[in-house]
Amino acid sequence: MKISLIISTYNRPEALRLSLMSAKVQTRIPDEVIIADDGSKENTRELIKNFAKDFPCPILHAWQEDKGFRLAESRNNALRMAHGDYIVFIDGDIIMERHFIADHERLAEKGYFVIGSRASLKNKLTLKLIKEKKINISFYTKGVRRKENALWLPFLTFCTKNLYRKRRFYGRGANMAMWFEDLRKVNGFDQELIGYGYEDFDLFNRLFNIGLKRKYAKFQAIEYHLFHERDSICSENERHFLKDMKRKRCKKGLKEIE
């Protein structure tokens, strides 16, 4: 199975550096890394170029012009470049625990998509890691919040099989994985969602509508989220999402750019 790791980013190269550092030391190196870039400046391009020189797998850069928050289209651009059978998504402010890709590979199963959680880092720790260019963090590190999400205990995952079963839209796009063929069936991400919010819930909903089930990667696929101020949800995206909850494909998605 070939795995493509897609990392979303926008003008935060100091955080992307740590994400790429964590990708480089995975126990299971992805077969390729694709940066879904929503219009970053030249310093991000230079960072990616420098990492690509000695990275253990190919790094591809899917860049689009900066015309506001267009995460859905950015991810579709990255998918257009993907060669993997299985796609793992994170954001460019994520540090992956070293078993992250191996965990997602182990959890991959036909008929399912996988969502995980994340531990959060306080601002002071985030600034320290960025300044020192280090990724050595764990459950025990001071400044880690939501520590229950930093516990790597994969033998306990089966105990959480029914966790959040009734919460249809539980999950985060910063830690999700699915088969590429399933993404094609629903036409990828909905590019009509412009502005922050609902890209992931919309995708989950359409995956459910084609008959997929969800796995929850509790105690596996551990990741740490670097601190930043929260963005405001775009109310227009919410209205667009709620307008048709039964649809299986989006009108403007992956197909339009293939």
Question: Which residues does each predicted region cover?
Answer:
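Glycine-rich, basic loop-to-helix element that forms the pyrophosphate-binding segment
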Residues: 65-82, 99
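Conserved donor NDP-sugar-binding/catalytic core segment of glycosyltransferases
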Residues: 99-140
